[in-house]
């Protein structure tokens, strides 16, 4: 069976890993980094992904960041006259990760396990699966990020029974899960979280502080200046990271904007204490889901054996201090918070291929599922934190006499009224025989698969007629749309490969022009003028082709010049060989002359002896 890669598709950074020899390994990207920024940019029809896209984000308005925050919504971003959905943008990132995984493995990759925040609802999970499909990946399993982290942490500890709390603070989402490990079984007891809280919010409080301080000093609001704002964002992210290791950091942004008197600079010292004051409300916001997860698992903080921190933002000292205070436990530092989720996904990939044995993963559904019943009430069929896969049925009836159809409104959430919860979908069961209200028996069944994706069925028990739906959100893509996007993604991948080949051909041509000039210089006066002219003409023809940027012409002219340069190089070697021979002959003559020399014996006479 081909390799199944594990992908942590993050809000700010993504990571890919694979199981090799029973051990999960993070695959470094082309720049040698183990994580890749989840950033996509478009420039003159060309797509850029990762570090290169992030670097030019200040000057390129066609840059998309943190798209994960919009998964499962009808959000679209218009770039160069085309609308892109979050699924398409995520697919571009996944294609990039897939490409460098293939380069590392030396084989085609078609299967993946992709992680999502534990608190992702059905629409967000479905959107992630669609993104994988568009990228040309068969998504074997969608697993929760904290669960993946627990897999990576606990793989070599499955013989010990322990309860662990995974605190996952990523770039844009926050999750906490309580799991029990033992006998190779990873069972999720509870999960809670906030999909609108992450490292980006910690950056934002620093940005707001910088904007306020600059406005106080100079009377100019930098938040209205797009270019300045991007520089502030980069500086805030760097300051946040610096303050994890030092107690104060200097933020220096020269020429941030211009005032009436000329250019203005931003110079400010940010202390860790000030940052902790600015972000205290965010740290406190993460504590409510921790308490909720413990309560749902029916555990006290003292019953937790280990706390695992996941996500780059858990390096913030105030976050570590808060979790220690809440649980009474020092967080486990044996895993890299940026990589552990991808490693866990790779292990799950190994479970699927059979490379990892005796490991069973029992995940849970993060939110309750049910339908709308009379009076707009939300009737739960499956409670949150139910182990998946699972199914549940309940019999309902009609609300009015002679009702021949029922609308099934499927919802996900925890609020008692339907209007306050998330609509997953609607469908209708028709042709119910007319009868007094309360007589027809309508069985509604919910089925959640191992990826957390929901199927709902309604059946009239009297007639046996049934209707079912695989839940797709209002923003969900139809099969035709997905197929179109898959095709476009493949075409773009081909275009990217063609563009790469063109760049390589141009680079080789430039190198050949330089090499030709060097060879001609070395052969000056050693070959006849006709050969030199022939080489110069071919070189000029290649330079002209490079200027016109006609790839086929560049290839042809490059091959012509290559042949001439090879002939000239042969001349150069011949000249060198002749010179060596001549030198060898001269040495031999010198040797013959040396043969006539007679060695004479001599006796040293000391001065004191001659004086006697």
Curated annotation (Swiss-Prot):
Residues 576-612 are annotated as: Disordered. Pfam families: HSP70. Keywords: ATP-binding, Chaperone, Nucleotide-binding, Phosphoprotein, Stress response. Residues 578-588 have a biased composition (Low complexity). It comes from the Bacteria. GO terms for molecular function: ATP binding; ATP-dependent protein folding chaperone; unfolded protein binding. The keyword Chaperone applies. The modification Phosphothreonine is found at residue 173. Induction: By stress conditions e.g. heat shock. Residues 596-612 have a biased composition (Acidic residues). Acts as a chaperone. Belongs to the heat shock protein 70 family. This is Chaperone protein DnaK.
